Amino acid sequence: MNPSEMQRKAPPRRRRHRNRAPLTHKMNKMVTSEEQMKLPSTKKAEPPTWAQLKKLTQLATKYLENTKVTQTPESMLLAALMIVSMVSAGVLNSSEETATIENGP
């Protein structure tokens, strides 16, 4: 190897960040309306009933008991979100979910 090949190349210079203000101005000019936000696949859902909320709370409590997790407001919220996401994703339907949670994993 000759000495010129042994020399290290200088790292490439970093480009300066451009001013982001023009992007902010573009966002301010954007107009969003409800017609633009609604997609054909969007479905209207009714608010949950008190009975549904009570059932969700019971299922979350059972799940936490079965997994031996301390029942705190945070863990209850996470358990409820886990149950809702699994049902909405179609992983479990509500009757399978109830049986699984009540009988243990």
UniProtKB/Swiss-Prot annotation:
Residues 1-48 are annotated as: Disordered. GO terms for molecular function: RNA binding. A motif (Nuclear localization signal) lies at residues 13-20. Its main location: cytoplasm. It is found in: Cytoplasm; Nucleus, Nucleolus. GO terms for cellular component: cytoplasm; nucleolus. Despite functional similarity, Rec shares almost no sequence homology with HIV-1 Rev and HTLV-1 Rex. Insertional polymorphism. Provirus present in 16% of tested individuals. Retroviral replication requires the nuclear export and translation of unspliced, singly-spliced and multiply-spliced derivatives of the initial genomic transcript. Rec interacts with a highly structured RNA element (RcRE) present in the viral 3'LTR and recruits the cellular nuclear export machinery. This permits export to the cytoplasm of unspliced genomic or incompletely spliced subgenomic viral transcripts. This is Endogenous retrovirus group K member 8 Rec protein. It comes from Homo sapiens (Human). The gene is ERVK-8.
